Amino acid sequence: MTSDVETTAEQQEVLIVTGMSGAGRSTVANALEDLDWYVVDNLPPQMLRPLIELANRAESGLPRIAAVVDVRGRNFFADLQEMIQSLREGTKVRVLFLEAADVTLVRRFEQVRRPHPLQGNGTLLDGITAERARLREIRESSDIIVDTSDLNIHQLATRITDIFADENTADVQVTVMSFGFKYGLPADADLVADARFLPNPFWKPELRPYTGLDEVVRNDVLQQNGAEEFIESYLEALRPIFAGYQRENKRHATIAVGCTGGKHRSVAIAEELAARLRSLPGLAVSIKHRDLGRE
C-alpha cells in the first residue's frame, strides 16, 4: 500500500536554486515567491529531504518547493550531489544554476563593498575563480542555466517569470536568442547555430544601417543560397530534441543563433526560426536579441 506522503511526493516539484555568489539568487527567490512557489533560502543540502517530508505532511500540501542552496563548502557540495540523486527517485527535482561573467561579479561585489565568501586573504577574482571551480560539476548537471551578466534585478525577475510562469500551459519554454560571436557565446545556451555561412549584409552599403528586424535585411538573408535549407534542416533536427525534452520534463531551452556582430544574419534567422517553431505543438516560444544595438 502506498502512503499519502509517498503519493504526494510523486506529484510534488522541487527546484534547487544554486550558482555563483552575486549572480542573483535572492532576486530569483523573490520572483519564485511571486509565482506562488514555497521558497526556503540558504538551506543546507542535508535539510532538503526533511523539508520535503514536512511539506508533504502539511494539510494543504506544497506542490512547488524552491530551495536556495549554498554549496560553497566542500562537504555541502558532495551532500547536494548525493541528495539530488536520492530525491529524484521519488520526486520531480530540477536544478537552476545562476552564473555571471567574472567582470560582472567583481563589479557587483565592489558596488556593495563586500568581500567574496571564498576570497580569504586573496582578491575578489581569486574567490570567484575558486567558487567557479568548485561549482563546475553541479553546473554541468543542472537542468536550467541562467546567465545574469547582462540582466538587472528587474530583467532577471522577468526572465524567471518567463521560464516558470506558464509551465502548466506548455511543455517546453523555448527562447530563441541571436548573438554576435565577437561578444562571446551565450553561457546559458542549450543549442548553438552558426549563421556566418551566409553572406554578410554588413558589406552591402545600402543594408549596413539596418538590422535583421528590418524587412529589407531579412529578405536579403533569407533568399541567400542555403538559408531555407538550413532553417528546414535545423527544424527537422529540433523535433526529436524537443520530444526528448518533453519526455524528460525539461521545461526550458535556449537556442542561440550567432553571426559576427549579432546585427544582421543571426537576427533574421532567429526571427524566422522562432516564427516557425511557434507552429509546433507543446512549445511556448519567445525571442531575444542579445547584442542588437551593441555595436
Curated annotation (Swiss-Prot):
Annotated GTP binding sites: D70, V71, R72, G73
Keywords, A to Z? ATP-binding, GTP-binding, Nucleotide-binding
For the keyword Transferase, the answer is no
User: According to its UniProt record, what is one Pfam family this protein matches?
Assistant: RapZ-like_N
Q: Does the keyword Nucleotide-binding apply?
A: yes
Residues binding ATP are G19, M20, S21, G22, A23, G24, R25, S26
A single GO molecular-function term is: GTP binding
Q: Where is the signal peptide?
A: none
Q: Which InterPro entries match?
A: P-loop_NTPase (IPR027417), RapZ-like (IPR005337), RapZ-like_N (IPR053930), RapZ_C (IPR053931)
Family assignment? Answer: Belongs to the RapZ-like family.
Q: What does this protein do?
A: Displays ATPase and GTPase activities.
- The identity of this protein, by name, is Nucleotide-binding protein Lxx11490
